[in-house]
Amino acid sequence: MCGIVGYIGYDNAKELLLKGLEKLEYRGYDSAGIAVVNDDNTTVFKEKGRIAELRKVADSSDFDGPVGIGHTRWATHGVPNHENSHPHQSSNGRFTLVHNGVIENYEELKGEYLQGVSFISETDTEVIVQLVEYFSNQGLSTEEAFTKVVSLLHGSYALGLLDAEDKDTIYVAKNKSPLLLGVGEGFNVIASDALAMLQVTSEYKEIHDHEIVIVKKDEVIIKDADGNVVERDSYIAEIDASDAEKGVYAHYMLKEIHEQPAVMRRIIQEYQDAEGNLKIDQDIINDVKEADRIYVIAAGTSYHAGLVGKEFLEKWAGVPTEVHVASEFVYNMPLLSEKPLFVYISQSGETADSRAVLVETNKLGHKSLTITNVAGSTLSREADHTLLLHAGPEIAVASTKAYTAQIAVLSILSQIVAKEHGREADIDLLRELAKVTTAIEAIVDDAPIMEQIATDFLETTRNAFFIGRTIDYNVSLEGALKLKEISYIQAEGFAGGELKHGTIALIEEGTPVVGLATQEKVNLSIRGNVKEVVARGAHPCIISMEGLEKEGDTYVIPHVHELLTPLVSVVALQLISYYAALHRDLDVDKPRNLAKSVTVE
């Protein structure tokens, strides 16, 4: 959600900033802009819409310089337009700012300090940059003014500030919003994500909340909230830039769907010891063993993965498990058990709602485990333990390979804990995950069939329903989410038995209903639910599993262990959703109004 880049060094900044913003497109945005400093002049280029439009405007000018900042905006305060786009400038044009996050007290600050100031935009960001000018006019240095303003802000922010009279510095601060320092020889950068600046460096330093950072081309000074200089080691971002390219695929989403077999193999390799046994850190095992209840905290697709993980944790490991939507949990925490363990699932490791819960549970002294795709992310740093997904960069807004990776890692965790508890395993998990990998490959190879299903069932519809029972119900929720995210079809997932309690009233002639039938004990029941909607005119699409199929089923997935079917059936739903959006000529990778990493609450 939004993205920031910045460069200070020896090279011209404009092209580096534009390329950096292009690498952040996956985060979701509705406008973009850059600001470049040369001598004592700052020039701002910004446009509503895609970065391609911004590039046209920026390339039409010869102005360039060795210092600059850039921003992709996902609207929170004010509609998407040119005036509300970042960067924002102070009234005298001296200060230029980019900001990710939400300032909760901006109206109060505006009323207290900025009476009579004329504002161009509706944003909270413009209040920040006008405050810097205000305190500068009171005689404070730029660093002092910036520090003073940051101390007044309530909410989340990642900030990058330029001063036209001090072209050798970018002033930086953050709180509850991701921002990194990139380190180079004779230059330094800032970025919301290491991917943005891999073009120039792979060496990064973390910025912690409430720190003030002075970035120059040949040094970086980090100060804590008390003004003390902080020494911090750098690390190498272990990301292959080629992993973030589409390669031969038309879209990132299609590429990432096709990568799932490789991701499964990587997970099997990473969580297996030399003797071929499952392995994770013993400290994690101990904390899970000691927990009397697990609370899974997540949002969106990660929440759906958590619902599947609950099945593993309870059925295999024997640990009572609850799955909660992060944005609700933080305001409505239930009565907790005596020895809870909190498991945070987040592809990016930056989900603001989940982080808000983690902050509260850390205050209570509860143990925590993050399952994420990004080492060094906020949730990873602030939790007691981390399990990595090893899925590689996921660029498409609609999550695919992270979902299956999350489920696979949860299955491994559950089996290891089951063994520690002395519970009999009814599954050779590594062997079964290998079967899952082969099954996913078979479905990916059947992409033309999925395209035909999408055409037959979803090309013209405005509504669709996904139904399942037991673990299939959890997958139906994810299938519906994928379809609505990228095709804009109103899609909902329901437990099969709940249709008759209200939803069946929405069924009319031709309404597509996707029924998942991969569970033997409810196979007849879910098929009965399909018959109920067919009797009312629905257009049924049944996805079943080998051994449970019936004549007339639309697609049959290869046979795998019944609790691992979500890893396989969801791939069919991902492809169907992809082709439904493709045939509607929609932007599959960057659907409207959505952001990849939701970094505001």
UniProtKB/Swiss-Prot annotation:
GO MF: carbohydrate derivative binding; glutamine-fructose-6-phosphate transaminase (isomerizing) activity
Pfam families: GATase_6, SIS
Domain Glutamine amidotransferase type-2: 2-218
Catalytic activity: D-fructose 6-phosphate + L-glutamine = D-glucosamine 6-phosphate + L-glutamate
The keyword Phosphoprotein is annotated on this UniProt entry: no
EC number: 2.6.1.16
Cell compartment(s), UniProt: Cytoplasm
Keyword list, A-Z: Aminotransferase, Cytoplasm, Glutamine amidotransferase, Repeat, Transferase
Presence of the UniProt keyword Magnesium in the record: no
Active site residues according to the UniProt entry: 2 (nucleophile), 596 (for fru-6p isomerization activity)
Annotated GO biological process: carbohydrate metabolic process; fructose 6-phosphate metabolic process; protein N-linked glycosylation; UDP-N-acetylglucosamine metabolic process
All residue ranges annotated as the SIS domain in the record: 284-423, 453-591
Coiled coil: none
One cellular component (GO) term of this entry: cytosol
Function: Catalyzes the first step in hexosamine metabolism, converting fructose-6P into glucosamine-6P using glutamine as a nitrogen source.
Subunit text: Homodimer.
HAMAP family: GlmS
Official protein name in the record: Glutamine--fructose-6-phosphate aminotransferase [isomerizing]
